[in-house]
Amino acid sequence: MESLYHQTNNVVKDIERDFQRLSQLSAQESLDVENGIQLKITQANANCDRLDVLLYKVPPSQRQSSKLRVDQLKYDLRHLQTSLQTARERRQRRMQEISEREQLLNHRFTANSAQPEETRLQLDYELQHHTQLGNAHRGVDDMIASGSGILESLISQRMTLGGAHKRIQAIGSTLGLSNHTMKLIERRLVEDRRIFIGGVVVTLLIIALIIYFLVL
């Protein structure tokens, strides 16, 4: 199990390096890297399924800590899958904007010799307006995607906290921890839950304000 865990963890780190490369590539060059990332995510998820089976072969005294490590891998992979989807949508928008811009430019150059100055100025204005509108839409989409990623991250953390609470209770019963120690641990979990709820509320408010002011 240890060998497969470290192998999967290395795949996750490799995917993170691919994302760093992705931010430096053009829209056309990004496609191959995105496909490579998807293959690695699929492979890592398959490894996690195997790790879930191997957990039952781990000694009971080590099973809880091993499960926590596997759960962390799953959480990282969910986050990477969301990031990949966001990157794909961003690339598609960039390619669409490039295509529309080229169409406007070609239309402008075709009409340049035959149309009067007023028409050329109108085409220049339309091109500038289209560029500004595309930038605004891309900014809104990026903010919404970023907010969605944050919300998904918070939800995943909430699920992780809930699972951790149950595992801590099980470990406490096994190890015979005192009631005072268990109460301290539960108090910390309650504080983490309040932080989670506050984070969700603040994130939703920020997204709502951004959309409101951009629409005005």
Curated annotation (Swiss-Prot):
Keywords: Coiled coil, Endoplasmic reticulum, Golgi apparatus, Membrane, Protein transport, Transmembrane, Transmembrane helix, Transport. The chain crosses the membrane at residues 195-215. One of its GO terms (molecular function) is SNARE binding. It is a single-pass type IV membrane protein. InterPro entries: GOSR2/Membrin/Bos1, v-SNARE_N_sf. It is found in: Golgi apparatus, cis-Golgi network membrane; Golgi apparatus membrane; Endoplasmic reticulum membrane. Residues 216 are vesicular. Its main location: Golgi. Involved in transport of proteins from the cis/medial-Golgi to the trans-Golgi network. This is Probable Golgi SNAP receptor complex member 2. The gene is Membrin.
